[in-house]
Amino acid sequence: AYPHWWYGDTGKVKPFGQKDNGGDLVETAFIMQALLSVHQYYIDGSPAEQALAARIDKLWREVDWNFYRQNGQNVLYWHWSPEYGWEMNFPVHGYNECLIMYILAAASPTHGVPAAVYHEGWAQNGAIVDPHKVENIELHLRYQGTEAGPLFWAQYSFLGLDPIGLKDEYCANYFDEMRNLTLVNRAYCVRNPKHYKGFGPDCWGLTASYSVNGYAAHAPNERDDQGVISPTAALSSIVYTPEQSLQVMRHLYEMGDKVFGPYGFYDAFSETDNWYPQRYLAIDQGPIAVMLENYRSGLLWKLFMSHPDVQKGLKELGFSTVSKLSLIHIS
């Protein structure tokens, strides 16, 4: 698996934390989701494009998902280090941003995991199902450590994975669930219980981003709300809440160069603290472009869902979909 960070000029690992200096299976899943989409885009292209697709296929086949079961357990672990081994000790349970990791682990043609790893590890034998209301909006999944997580939980797994009509035994419709998670985030910001300046229907969206106090995972609860709006939160939600997200986009654009620069909207800001850092974070910028295109044409969803290994993995885990966008019907 790939590390969370590495130096582009040397290929050496840049530690994400003291003991997080090795493989990161979640970040590996995110890049593989992207690469499999690129593979499908180029697979029938020119000789050079087909050669690139072949290189991607080699990278895909080399990821050892099964190793991250830590001696054959029916759960996937987030980290492994050549120096510290399994000391990070982070078994991944749902729901959070990591759904795609379990799907790709089942989809791997070379180092795949059995369906029991998903059902016992991610879904914890059904404990992931937890019907509850937040901001008077219905949610049906258990969110790790909170009643409703930050918005990247509704986005990262679904940059390529098409949520429309996607279901399994734990969730009747992933699109509806993620839309409701987004609406919870918006409703919390509109209610604005901590009375931050600027929050409202035109300015909402809590997710992981820079903040006044460093990088933080902002979420719709008073503990995790620091008054920081991250444009990626609402903009990358455009597939779920097009009207509400466009309302935020127009408002942010009208705010001018305090929040908008040469590469689009800056990562985060706080009107309460008069904090406008004017800096970018790639993992926040990227989903904006991807989700805008998925909203416009469904392109990335179509590409990813068309990969035969992805279809195999979804089927093995018991997923079905009737999405008209992806044109792939799995039952």
Residue ranges and their predicted role:
Residues 1-327:
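Ser/Thr/Asn(+Pro)-rich, low-complexity disordered segments
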